[in-house]
């Protein structure tokens, strides 16, 4: 029994405990940083095939990058709650002690769970958010990612799966114009590209296997009295089917995606193509993405006994544009890991890229091999933090590149694929090889 003398102390302690619980902040994030050298001299170089949308990342990252996430459950009553989430990202070239940069405010959203009585388990949200992103870690490639400012309702239980609805936005500088004066159009504004996303996930279709289906529609949302650049892509669709299978203490994901017009450029669900690209003082040129994209992707991570883990990826992507400036991209790679102890391992990554230009018919190819000795917090290929020392060798042979010489009003090939020796020039990276070595840390928490 609490006496009256002890009651104020008990109340104070209880209030302090409740206050501490109420003020608890979740701290999550990701970071990587290190130092590297190039065999022929100078700082570490990184290797990516011209025309490829990503690169094999182990021992092949030349920047310091960090995402710092702070979040808190700010209200809870029974099973109903509100959660506030933020994310600030930084990237610098890791060349000096003091490297100033402007942070990117990538997330600021509120998620409300179980707020709709007749939709138990669902979440409504609004704000900037990383929204249900799908990626291949070993090549840092996001193949389904509509992140940005938006709003939505997710995880609606429909009996055989979970339904999610969302709308997000990505803007392009100079994407539309207004009539100014003297027959001049002003391209300094931005075009708002809206994306509307519908997903049906967690459909159990076989033992250990689930299916997710999605449809994304993107369109340019013009202001009144504005017009799109001639030839710009106004809208497009992305259709996605992904099967996830539990296998060998890991997973395998098989993905098929088909996109049209404005959804083909990045091919991940963000609408692009209503914009105008600028190159310093050069004139503007429009981005015409009309056409289609087909992507077939298989990737995963598995455990092969007590001492071996492995990541792998294989992908074919065909972007076929009406302006013949598309590409066909094949990539295949593996990252086996041998565990000497629960905290020390040797990791090797072997990756190959081949990119064919639709316009020239020429091909760029590269293979890259990295060997790394690593110390990590656990015995999984996903264990982090990790500190690794590495050596990387890359060899490439590029027969084409993009022409950015002059300006778009003088050079009819500006921004287009051309042969490596076009007009006596030198486009692409030629035929060469290089090796690098260094040390890196990587962490997520």
Curated annotation (Swiss-Prot):
Principal subcellular localisation of the protein: membrane
Entry keywords, A to Z: Cell outer membrane, Ion transport, Membrane, Porin, Signal, Sugar transport, Transmembrane, Transmembrane beta strand, Transport
GO biological process: monoatomic ion transport
Gene3D superfamilies: Porin, LamB type
Induction or repression: By maltose.
SUPFAM superfamilies: Porins (SSF56935)
Site (Greasy slide, important in sugar transport): 30, 65, 98, 251, 382, 444
GO cellular component: cell outer membrane; pore complex
Signal peptide range in chain numbering: 1-24
Domain of life, per lineage: Bacteria
Membrane-protein topology: Multi-pass membrane protein
Record site: Important in sugar transport: 142
Reactions it catalyzes: beta-maltose(in) = beta-maltose(out)
UniProt subcellular location: Cell outer membrane
GO MF entries: maltodextrin transmembrane transporter activity; maltose transporting porin activity
Subunit organization: Homotrimer formed of three 18-stranded antiparallel beta-barrels, containing three independent channels.
Family: Belongs to the porin LamB (TC 1.B.3) family.
Protein's job: Involved in the transport of maltose and maltodextrins.
UniProt-recorded name of the protein: Maltoporin
Protein species of origin: Shigella flexneri
Native organism taxonomy: Bacteria, Pseudomonadati, Pseudomonadota, Gammaproteobacteria, Enterobacterales
